[in-house]
Amino acid sequence: MGQNFSKKSGNDLVSRIVFTILILIVCRFGSFIPIPGIDSIALSSVAEKNQSGILGMFNMLSGGSLGRMSIFALAIMPYITASIIIQLMSVAYKPLENLKKEGEVGKRKVNQLSRYLTVLLASFQAYGVAISLESIVTNTGPVVILAGFFFRVTTVITLVVGTMLLMWLGEQITQRGIGNGTSLIIFIGIISGVPSAIISMFELSRKGALSPLIALAVCIGVVVLIAIIIFFEKAQRKLLVQYPKRQVGNKIYGGEATHMPLKLNTSGVIPPIFASSILLFPATLANFSNSNSETMGMLTYYLGHGKPVYILLYVALIMFFSFFYTAIVFNSEETANNLRKYGAYIPGKRPGKNTSDYFDYILTRLTVIGGIYLSVICVIPELLMNKYVISLSLGGTSFLIVVNVVLDTMTQIQTYLFSSKYEGLMKKVKLKN
């Protein structure tokens, strides 16, 4: 009986993994279907010109969909942005915060709000893309074959439907597959660009444009970078939590001590993504609109990759968003109240405000270290990419996302296997009884 259960749970895990892989293949297939009315030759020259801007970063996150202007050009970014906005609003807007506390029903309503906001954001972004494409004229001609109202409408509908389809596919992976669907879609997009980035680097080395020693150093650096990211992402501060003893009849229960883990990098990959988006927007706007404005020219120059102003602002924004997002993810006051509700306490700290202040003190120190770690991981590859023409797919932000998704998926697989074994053990105990 135990063997049959183990075999059944193993087959279930395999079916989940196969389902996830099939959905990701569909996502990759869709990234090669272009939107109607685009001159692919003219578009490719524009994509090459904007490889280092925010366009390049979003193109990397979308697995090249934006550069090819496919139906998945907006990727799943509008959904992520909408989810973050709803999360921010739930902190500032009391009715939304109360809605989140209503259990499964409240969660479904919040998710529905995220979907509505996704449609709105995707519509605005799609219209902006359509207008921008119509304004671009290259040496080979305009990017849009037949500009006008019909092109704008079809582009908006196509891109919004593409984003919503990706969102739905991501939800299917989360529910019926393994891992977080949204993260895995971004993950597969980044991974798809790594082989071409490596081939391009060795091609430059073969032609003499890049030293073979530098190419080898980059490969070794990537391995070291991954090891550093794994170390810091797994690092955590464990706080001792004590539960009081309870007497029921003649027996005494409880009194055990557990640990509350606080991650060193609580904010994850959000700070670098937000910081890059803000800093690279002016340069990308100038490239997209073919603007010759002196102000735009200065912004493009000073906010270019590797420039001192860019690096300083980049680090400052990463630190800011590290603190900002950590405050959203971990609510010290709410956690302290929950501990008090269950009778738990931190040894040496009074329940309530004293415990909340202690959490803030620990989190502040952890966030400073986490922010410095994110800054170093993102800035050093940034400087190298600026000097040695290396693809964004080999940058710090991309590896942060990839490593985080792999670690999260592996944890889910381990949890699934452990829970399956536990259920099998409980069934054996019931049969014996």
Curated annotation (Swiss-Prot):
GO terms for cellular component: plasma membrane. It is a multi-pass membrane protein. It comes from the Bacteria. GO terms for biological process: intracellular protein transmembrane transport; protein targeting; protein transport by the Sec complex. It is found in: Cell inner membrane. Pfam families: SecY (PF00344). Keywords: Cell inner membrane, Cell membrane, Membrane, Protein transport, Translocation, Transmembrane, Transmembrane helix, Transport. The chain crosses the membrane at residues 17-37, 71-91, 117-137, 141-161, 184-204, 212-232, 268-288, 310-330, 366-386, 388-408. Component of the Sec protein translocase complex. Heterotrimer consisting of SecY, SecE and SecG subunits. The heterotrimers can form oligomers, although 1 heterotrimer is thought to be able to translocate proteins. Interacts with the ribosome. Interacts with SecDF, and other proteins may be involved. Interacts with SecA. The central subunit of the protein translocation channel SecYEG. Consists of two halves formed by TMs 1-5 and 6-10. These two domains form a lateral gate at the front which open onto the bilayer between TMs 2 and 7, and are clamped together by SecE at the back. The channel is closed by both a pore ring composed of hydrophobic SecY resides and a short helix (helix 2A) on the extracellular side of the membrane which forms a plug. The plug probably moves laterally to allow the channel to open. The ring and the pore may move independently. Belongs to the SecY/SEC61-alpha family. This is Protein translocase subunit SecY.
